[in-house]
């Protein structure tokens, strides 16, 4: 009887060992089959204090129709001036209308940098030097981050690439891949997704083309649900494309409902991994909005985005420096005082957010913005760590 018990125990132990061995081997094989994904973590140890440099700024900055030596000098002046205003990050416009502010082999040269550039031939045939390369070098030389700013779908003010078209998505990914060959710190999308006034291009040809609104096929706006579905496909692909290479951010308009209706799926982006590394809502109002001047619109919209951000995606707030001193546009705060921007920055800091971005560079030197800029500069050298932003790529 005792021998039988011993034999039974022995066989049980052998069986368990065999199962463990098989499971271990299976697990090892499974690990071989599915290699681990590298996770890149980018940390900001201080707040982002940024400015958008738009294609509309280029001429005043001395970047249009100039020789390489002059461009390089003026790009460096731009970066130094940004630093004087407490800026540590520049969002530089590299794609405004399906074009390129760099020596692209696919896209035409941006005419806001070279006014006589070919409308059909790629930028390599128009630029004798590479504007983006020089801007990146100037920024990094002075310790400023440089993010490449793209309007993904916009072809003209009235016409956009169709987000529904796979060709449109592939075309934008080509632009992103080209830009990632430069030492940019980020890829940044503006809020233009479904905003075309006249229609959307459905481009089925891979050959180079020139825009002709009169003959373009149009694919008019689908339902809001489909809009978000089409745009989400692009956002996921860009996130994957930038993995381990650059930070991917999107700057939506400041009205959550309008965003959701125009293809900006904030609910999904701010609740899930794999979409955006950082969100930058454009909250372009004061807390003295409306006929009465008593509506706290900035604070209200800021709260909406914070509540929407279930995943705690790093958030930087776009601020409307360009509206400083404005009268009669339904937002009395801009004409009432010159401390709106500095007050908004303080609010951003109180909420522990990632920082702010000013629209746009030329307004730093515009007469009616002087008071706002002066008050902003008083608090721009805020050194304390506000939030440690960790960007994990999966």
Located regions from the model:
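Polysaccharide-binding and catalytic clefts of secreted carbohydrate-active enzymes
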Residues: 81, 103, 108, 122-125, ...
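Sec-dependent signal peptide cleavage junction
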Residues: 19-36
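Catalytic domains of carbohydrate-active enzymes, especially glycoside hydrolases
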Residues: 73-100, 181-186, 274-279, 348-356
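Short, acidic/polar
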Residues: 63-83, 165-178, 258-274, 333-349
